[in-house]
Curated annotation (Swiss-Prot):
This is Broad specificity amino-acid racemase. The keyword Isomerase applies. It comes from the Bacteria. Belongs to the alanine racemase family. Bsr subfamily. It comes from Pseudomonas putida (strain ATCC 47054 / DSM 6125 / CFBP 8728 / NCIMB 11950 / KT2440). Residues 1-24 form the signal peptide. Its main location: periplasm. Substrate binds at residues 174, 349. Its EC number is 5.1.1.10. Pfam families: Ala_racemase_C, Ala_racemase_N.
Amino acid sequence: MPFRRTLLAASLALLITGQAPLYAAPPLSMDNGTNTLTVQNSNAWVEVSASALQHNIRTLQAELAGKSKLCAVLKADAYGHGIGLVMPSIIAQGVPCVAVASNEEARVVRASGFTGQLVRVRLASLSELEDGLQYDMEELVGSAEFARQADAIAARHGKTLRIHMALNSSGMSRNGVEMATWSGRGEALQITDQKHLKLVALMTHFAVEDKDDVRKGLAAFNEQTDWLIKHARLDRSKLTLHAANSFATLEVPEARLDMVRTGGALFGDTVPARTEYKRAMQFKSHVAAVHSYPAGNTVGYDRTFTLARDSRLANITVGYSDGYRRVFTNKGHVLINGHRVPVVGKVSMNTLMVDVTDFPDVKGGNEVVLFGKQAGGEITQAEMEEINGALLADLYTVWGNSNPKILVD
């Protein structure tokens, strides 16, 4: 929803009810991206490749070969790519299941025309769960107390709520029932005994992207689900068992079970060896101007960089408020006209400086690639992760949620 329409809706709600509307998450856009004119006027933006996304979906579906259902994880506004941008591709490629985190994400998924299976992949607050009933969404349950509370909410609305019971098989210790203890097993049995909850799936989530660790967690999950199915007298044919995230889906095929939950792989975020998956996002900015400074000058806050020669520095219209973090100070590189140039001085809130002394063709208005490809050059996932000290998702979810997004190709 464009800002002006969001503001109008909020104003009308305030006038009519005397209260501001409540959102479980910020309103997300249903538009097919920011138009090109808006991007040209933005200090930084994200480009999302529809062709790369569709290629990745087809590649993954071919790898699953119909043996496991694909559930596309679109939490964090589709990992920063924009649910409103990616849902047409999800629907076009026949993906049967979508997973989200917030009610606002669920709203956009349903508003896009998706009528398939919709699952929340984290525990909801009770108010979220109640509000989420309108989206026909399956909920995660990981404790007997929460199950009783969810049951009461469903009963109050005259509904039966479909649930996925989360088990702590891999030691994530976040959402799941601890089936390694007898008290935990008793709790799991209580969850299956709620009148207004229908158990449709058993799931776990792997804590480490390591094949041996995944297999250990999978073995525990298999034992625990076998026990629960037997002692709760569940019909296995009516249950979906799922555990695999993107890493486990691609690297440990036996973990795929009935369904896989893939997010990163859909957008090209995989282990380096999986080159068949294409990156769906690029992060870009502009050169504002190029300045000349003499040798000996310092650059930026705290004088962390001193020019060793007379230099030409390009002023880039992006900073840490846009998700280009200060950790890239004196370490990062960007692409301008295909030239790989270094970040010099501290990254500021809205500005960074790069050294373009060796490239006289660089001028104000040039496009800058902060992450992605340009004219044969590339700012890679590996280098960004090494400097940032974290998974790339720690960066690109922020880029996508802090800057305008546009759908390309």
